[in-house]
Amino acid sequence: MSDMINIRETGYNFTTILKRLEAATSRLEDLVESGHKPLPNMHRPSRDSNSQTHNISFNIGTPTAPTVSTGSPAVASLHDQVAAAISPRNRSLTSTSAVEAVPASISAYDEFCSKYLSKYMELSKKIGGLIAEQSEHVEKAFNLLRQVLSVALKAQKPDMDSPELLEFLKPIQSELLTITNIRDEHRTAPEFNQLSTVMSGISILGWVTVEPTPLSFMSEMKDSSQFYANRVMKEFKGKDDLQIEWVRSYLTLLTELITYVKTHFKTGLTWSTKQDAVPLKTALANLSASKTQAPSSGDSANGGLPPPPPPPPPSNDFWKDSNEPAPADNKGDMGAVFAEINKGEGITSGLRKVDKSEMTHKNPNLRKTGPTPGPKPKIKSSAPSKPAETAPVKPPRIELENTKWFVENQVDNHSIVLDSVELNHSVQIFGCSNCTIIIKGKLNTVSMSNCKRTSVVVDTLVAAFDIAKCSNFGCQVMNHVPMIVIDQCDGGSIYLSKSSLSSEVVTSKSTSLNINVPNEEGDYAERAVPEQIKHKVNEKGELVSEIVRHE
């Protein structure tokens, strides 16, 4: 009875171990085949149910392979091959044939995207519309950045102005341009501030071209995005928590990207310095070949690409002379018709008297020959009209003359940063449209005039910030400004910091102005600037004025 139990237990153990050995053998064969070095005389164990029972024992606590106490050639051969396969020499062979390990910087980037980019994408899809459409290109841009990081680790560093580098970064630039176009094409959309938040911050991906301190550039791009993000949070505070969560997820995405670059690429993009590093041109060719290999096989399997569509049919105007004048509209102007009718008797003043020789009822011969054709009207050869004179477009300008900075005639430029200002410097901003200007440091004064949809971010001013004849402007004070003077402006928002609450704001001939004051929660409370003033003369004959408030 005990022998039967021993046989059953031994058979059960043998079956279990046999399955394990079979799985290990199959795995080793796959690894060796991937390295094109198959193991000799490798045979899978037989699954014959009539094979005799063998006693297999293990040495618990030791790293050695299982021992087989049997005389079966098949199992003994299997044991020898498995033991040889897991030896240190063959383990090194297997490791070299396996897939290369992912570099630490790439692995960290994947973790960053899965944690922060996926959160932003999830919220964008919940909101939908233009925000979701723009987010798809943001995701593509971040995926292309991973490709740039991977290729740079294998390629030699090119010249910063080389055509290979421009071609290398062209896909990312294309996505950034698409993100900008989505925002510019929907200026009147309700989501304009959200689209501007993403557009202003996505230029942060340009850090790969900045050396040796990309972190300062990235911080500037995040500050540009923060300006519009504050607008979004102010607009939807207490109304739509999803919008608040969305804009915070995007700011977190930018912040964590700065942290990632600070950890792995503090001095700029890292290129390969190994002996086996290839030129960037070769790396791009290999990348293109790997991309086109998979689609080409799929196309051949499906019978190739479909033939091109036939050309469009020829136009009906193909045979017409281009110099032939266009026929006049037969419908005419109904307004002119009614004007002629309203002339009354004067409508016949332009008619001439018909001679008797031209009357058909008195001259029967005219009925046979038909009416005499009148003279052809002469076509007036009008000289080409002179195009309307347009105002000359002045060239953009950003330069320092003595102690004065000039930022003039900038259009759709959201990357203007003045970070080398001094205490005696002043900045004059003129004729800019749809721009964001960041002024870092402490300086004397800033003046902005004749600008549209232009936002200015300043740190500290000694004197004042003058704004004149601007529309839809923005001004954000990061530290302290003693006085802000606004004259003849239509639409504007001023964001004060906690250290600039004592600033004086003087307004004249201006409408639709708002001053945003920070609160304890980190958001802004909007305060409208009064526009109506009531005047009256008192008993002493003096004019007394007071603000009209609408509660």
From Swiss-Prot:
| Ranges for domain C-CAP/cofactor C-like | 395-529
> Any idea which GO molecular function terms this record carries?
actin binding; adenylate cyclase binding
Give residue spans, biased composition: Polar residues.
288-300
- Which of UniProt's keywords are assigned here? Phosphoprotein
Q: Where are the transmembrane segments?
A: none
Which SUPFAM superfamilies did the record assign? C-terminal domain of adenylylcyclase associated protein, N-terminal domain of adenylylcyclase associated protein, CAP
* One GO term of the biological process aspect: cAMP-mediated signaling
Cite the record's Pro residues compositional bias ranges.
Answer: 305-315
Q: What is this protein called?
A: Adenylyl cyclase-associated protein
Q: What does this protein do?
A: The N-terminal domain binds to adenylyl cyclase, thereby enabling adenylyl cyclase to be activated by upstream regulatory signals, such as Ras. The C-terminal domain is required for normal cellular morphology and growth control.
Q: Name one GO cellular component term.
A: cytoplasm
Q: Name one Pfam family in it.
A: CAP_C
Family affiliation: Belongs to the CAP family.
Residue segments, region Disordered: 34-55, 288-333, 348-395
Q: Where is the composition biased (Basic and acidic residues)?
A: 352-361
Residues with the modification Phosphothreonine, per the entry, are T96
Say if the entry is tagged with keyword Lipid metabolism.
Answer: no
Q: Which residues carry this modification: Phosphoserine?
A: S92
